[in-house]
């Protein structure tokens, strides 16, 4: 519980810390039967390809977790699970309270049938997703994709076994607001998106955002083919209030040519100017110095659908 020290600045955070402590206590959760504990299973196993066809690349297993009072406030996890199932990704949704038990089961399943592991959680479920990844790390297993959606403030740092991490949060929110960092030495793809300037986005509807859900489904579908050249650079954004919510995977370094400016680089890489300015403080000169390094956000694979500017209504 060392990561709770100094974090309990208000009653809401104290409650979140207590929930986290109960969640990761060795008992009684380790003995729970998920059939009794009540995860709502929305998935079925994906159908096997015809015998005459070559085996498809493994598309992974997705484990999704609701937050506190999840059946009331985290229903977006259920709809996201259904969307993953509809495109052939085995996916289950659970209450965060049985997270350790599900992680133990996932480890056993992986030993029998290795497949990419995807972890997605909302609120306390976001904390669960990161702790789940820590359990995998202890067993020498990688997590292909971890997504935290407005996770609890007490969420720990991202462990080194995570290939891709995305944090979508509301910095000023007392129910979530977890600004999750990665551990020193992290070499995976890291992207953090603060939506606090989007007034229409709340803790209780952020996981229901159709634009966010569609992009996450795309990222899961592209796990087998997503590649990137060069070392990934972490990116952290405060998304402007009227900007579409676009979930890049990480950043990459490009080098200015004679006559280049922030505007010309943004146009060349098809990204909004604000995304270049935020990641390159102090480099707003025009023109840039030839050879100057500029960090540009990127997708590991082109989005399967265009990112829309639609935002969720208050629900």
Where are these regions (language model features)?
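Bacterial N-terminal signal peptides that target proteins for export
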Residues: 4-18
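Primarily a LysM-type cell-wall glycan-binding module
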Residues: 239-270, 292-294
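Bacterial N-terminal signal peptides
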Residues: 15-28
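Intrinsically disordered, low-complexity Ser/Thr-rich linker and spacer segments
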Residues: 236-253, 297-315
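Signal peptide processing junction and immediate N-terminal pro/mature segment
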Residues: 26-41
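Lipolytic serine-hydrolase domain surface
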Residues: 69, 77-79, 160-236
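Active-site catalytic motif of lipid deacylating hydrolases and related acyltransferases
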Residues: 42-45, 49-115, 202, 238
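Serine-dependent carboxylesterase/thioesterase catalytic core
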Residues: 59-62, 81-84, 91-96, 104-183
């Amino acid at each position: 519980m060392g990561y709770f020290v100094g974090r309990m600045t208000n009653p809401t955070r104290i409650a979140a810390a207590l929930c986290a402590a109960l969640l990761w206590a060795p008992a009684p959760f380790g003995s729970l039967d998920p059939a009794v504990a009540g995860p709502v299973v929305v998935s079925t196993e994906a159908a096997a390809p015809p015998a005459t066809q070559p085996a498809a690349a493994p598309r992974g297993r997705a484990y999704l977790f609701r937050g506190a009072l999840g059946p009331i406030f985290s229903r977006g996890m259920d709809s996201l699970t259904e969307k993953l199932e509809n495109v052939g990704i085995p996916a289950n949704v659970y209450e965060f309270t049985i997270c350790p038990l599900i992680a133990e089961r996932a480890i056993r399943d992986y030993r029998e049938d290795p497949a990419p592991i995807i972890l997605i959680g909302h609120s306390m479920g976001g904390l669960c997703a990161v702790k789940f990844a820590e359990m995998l790390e202890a067993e020498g297993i990688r997590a292909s994709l971890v997504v935290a959606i407005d996770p609890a403030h007490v969420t720990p740092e991202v462990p080194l076994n995570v290939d891709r991490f995305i944090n979508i949060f509301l910095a000023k929110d007392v129910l979530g607001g977890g600004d999750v960092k990665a551990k020193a030495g992290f070499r995976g793809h890291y992207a953090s998106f603060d939506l606090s300037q989007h007034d229409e986005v709340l803790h209780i509807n952020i996981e229901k955002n159709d634009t966010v859900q569609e992009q996450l489904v795309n990222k899961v579908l592209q796990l087998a083919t997503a590649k990137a050249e060069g070392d990934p650079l972490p990116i952290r954004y405060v998304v402007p209030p009227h900007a579409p919510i676009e979930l890049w995977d990480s950043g990459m370094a490009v080098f200015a040519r004679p006559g280049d400016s922030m505007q010309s680089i943004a146009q060349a890489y098809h990204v909004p100017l604000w995304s270049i300015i935020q990641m390159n403080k102090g480099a707003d000169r025009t023109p840039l110095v030839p050879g100057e390094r500029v960090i540009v956000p990127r997708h590991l694979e082109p989005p399967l659908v265009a990112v829309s500017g639609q935002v969720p209504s208050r629900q």
